[in-house]
């Protein structure tokens, strides 16, 4: 009896356990069916907040989303639904695992520049599905985070280290829009030690030996981002906005040995020659033109005034070009003779006339001013002297030859008649003083019986008429 009773009770307990498990499975299936079939929009006033979402695309086929929300319970599930705004039948589901979800497009699909999605959040809580709007205009091209560069390698040679890397084949049409940043350091240093940026449109980089410490082991890593397009594309709304990618796997390399001497590549020599030769030819031509045109420029800007030193030797040899001292010495000679001092000036007189004669083609001789007509009626003035008393003997010999100077008749003014002298009762005291700088023959004036030798000419006062 006791054994049969225990067996019966065991069967009863087993049946109860089976029933409980069955009911649990049925409840779970019903709850899951209710979450799939019922959508309850999230109310803004109460309930659990959705939190913030960050969805970044690799610009090819993948979107990574991060959800900064409270931890989900075991009875809750959440996912993001991407619905195309161009083709509503295209929908992609991204299920969260530990606040992260990754959407991978099928192999036959890629993201295009004009793709536009609506993102909604779906949560199943206690058998009810809650739907909330995340973004109604999600543009993958403005939320780009590229994959890090792959296959980073180093090639150390004499004096340099060449780093190369690769990119996805789908990004090759956009290679000119890719910008890289390189970080390199010694193994014992931090990564923030050395950086190189502004590496655009290339997949290689050269590190010179002078940038690295000799005898050290270095590590380098790389990251990439897509640069903005031109301003015109930005105004039209078709620009790209990118974040820096994650760092690539580091590569190690020894520092290259520095070169002993400065070796300039052959192509740099050729470029230098192409620059130096035209400059040299240009300077040579400029110097040639300068020396060729300098005499002409001097003749244009500077007048060539001849020096009278060759004709007046005493003026420059004795008086050093002082004309006033030279003329003062010439006047002092006749004055000394009048005072009774015998001074011979024949040599100086002849030298002066010889110097003047060299300037003309005929011997020089003193000329008489025909414009000064002597009037015999004037008191105190002798009559007009004759030409035989004025011209020296040397001038008489050249009467038949043409003179180098203008004839004396041409020196006379237009009016041949001299106005009458002023009346004595007019009281006019206008006189002009004539100072003869040269010596005159006294025999030219009648009534003088002095020596025929030259004497100093005295100033002569001539009356000047004030009447028109």
Curated annotation (Swiss-Prot):
A motif (Box 1 motif) lies at residues 301-309. It is a single-pass type I membrane protein. The chain crosses the membrane at residues 271-291. Gene3D superfamilies: Immunoglobulins. Residues 38-270 are extracellular. One of its GO terms (cellular component) is extracellular region. The WSXWS motif appears to be necessary for proper protein folding and thereby efficient intracellular transport and cell-surface receptor binding. The box 1 motif is required for JAK interaction and/or activation. This is Interleukin-9 receptor. It comes from Mus musculus. The gene is Il9r.
């Amino acid at each position: 009896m006791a054994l049969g009773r225990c067996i019966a009770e065991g069967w009863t307990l087993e049946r109860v356990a089976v029933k409980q498990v069955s009911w649990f499975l049925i409840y779970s299936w019903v709850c899951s069916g209710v979450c799939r079939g019922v959508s309850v929009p999230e109310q803004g006033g109460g309930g659990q907040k959705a939190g913030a979402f960050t969805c970044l695309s690799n610009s090819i086929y993948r979107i990574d989303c991060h959800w900064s929300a409270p931890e989900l319970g075991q009875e809750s599930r959440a996912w993001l639904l991407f619905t195309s705004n161009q083709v509503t039948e295209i929908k992609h589901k991204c299920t969260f695992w530990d606040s992260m979800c990754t959407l991978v497009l099928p192999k036959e699909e890629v993201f295009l520049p004009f793709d536009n999605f609506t993102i909604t959040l779906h949560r199943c809580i206690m058998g009810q599905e809650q739907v909330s709007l995340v973004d109604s205009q999600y543009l993958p091209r403005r939320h780009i985070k590229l994959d890090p560069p792959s296959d980073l390698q180093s090639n150390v040679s004499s004096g340099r280290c060449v780093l190369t890397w690769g990119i996805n084949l789908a990004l090759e049409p956009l290679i000119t829009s890719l910008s890289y940043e390189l970080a390199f350091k010694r193994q014992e240093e931090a990564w923030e030690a050395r950086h190189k940026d502004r590496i655009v449109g290339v997949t290689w980089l050269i590190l010179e030996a002078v940038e690295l410490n000799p005898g050290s082991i270095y590590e380098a890593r790389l990251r990439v981002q897509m640069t903005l397009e031109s301003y015109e594309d930005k105004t039209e709304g078709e620009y790209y906005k990118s974040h820096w990618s994650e760092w690539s796997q580091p590569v190690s390399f020894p520092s290259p040995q520095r070169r002993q001497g400065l070796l300039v590549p052959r192509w740099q020599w050729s470029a230098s020659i192409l620059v130096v030769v035209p400059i040299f030819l240009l300077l040579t031509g400029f110097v040639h033109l300068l020396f060729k045109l300098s005499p002409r420029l001097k003749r244009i800007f500077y007048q060539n005034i001849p020096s009278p030193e060759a004709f007046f030797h005493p003026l420059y040899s004795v008086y050093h070009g002082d004309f006033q001292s030279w003329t003062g010495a010439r006047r002092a000679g006749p004055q000394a003779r009048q005072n009774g001092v015998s001074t011979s000036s024949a040599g100086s007189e002849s030298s002066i006339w010889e110097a003047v004669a060299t300037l003309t083609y005929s011997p020089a001789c003193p000329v008489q001013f025909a414009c000064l007509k002597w009037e015999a009626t004037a008191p105190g003035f002798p009559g007009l002297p004759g030409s035989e008393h004025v011209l020296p003997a040397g001038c008489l010999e050249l009467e038949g030859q043409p003179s180098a100077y203008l004839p004396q008749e041409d020196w006379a003014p237009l009016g041949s008649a001299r106005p009458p002298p002023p009346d004595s009762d007019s009281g006019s005291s206008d006189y002009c003083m004539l100072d003869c700088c040269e010596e005159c023959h006294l025999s030219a004036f009648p009534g003088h019986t002095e020596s025929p030798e030259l004497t100093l000419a005295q100033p002569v006062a001539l009356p000047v008429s004030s009447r028109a």
